[in-house]
Amino acid sequence: MNIGVVPARLASKRLPKKIIADLDGKPMVVDTMEQVLKAQKLDKVILAIDSEETFDALKDYGFDMVMTSKDHCSGTDRVAEVVKKNEDAEVIINVQGDEPLIDVNIIDDLVDLFEDKDVNMGTAISKKLTVDDLLDDNVVKAIIDQDKNVIDFKRNIYDSEIGGLYRHIGIYCFRWNALFQFSMLDRSPR
């Protein structure tokens, strides 16, 4: 089974409550969920929330919501909590809640990557990285090596060696076991 999980943490640091911020008359995460639900290759889509306020703002939209701990260090940890209860999941797609313009084709393409049994995890990047993007700390930059492996993610690249630099798209994908291995890794000090 292929599962999409949208982690939606209310207490975001840079823009608190952004997931329920009004975007054309509805909470931003609603647009994200509507996009993810259009993916052809997902069997199930779950919204992973962490507050009653989020639940109250979204309950009338009919999404499959799971209340998660407020104590997670990352959205991926929130996804792991949800997926732990779905052991029949083979491929897990983690789309960040603040991606209302996510291209559903990217989701389906990432699911297709897992036809190769050697693939355990991945993400999406774009070559479209402008000078403004480079200077914007709100844009996550993915630094990749010559084999197209991501070696780091950065918001601020001022202290970085410029090499294979791409714009990161807020989506990750994992096999079930890889998700839990990843969520058990020590956190970066950054």
Question: Where in the sequence are the language-model features?
Answer:
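Short beta-strand segments
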Residues: P7, N94-Q96, A124-I125
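Short glycine-enriched, charge-decorated loop/helix-capping segments at active-site entrances
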Residues: I19-L23, V66-T68, S188
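Residue-level signal for inorganic ion chemistry
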Residues: V29, D98, R175
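N-terminal glycine-rich phosphate-binding loop and ensuing alpha1 helix
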Residues: M1-A48
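Short, high-confidence coil segments that cap the C-terminus of an alpha-helix
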Residues: L42, D88-A89, D116-N120
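Short phosphate-binding loop-to-helix
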Residues: I46, E52-V95, L101-D112
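Conserved core of the sugar-phosphate nucleotidyltransferase
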Residues: I102-S188
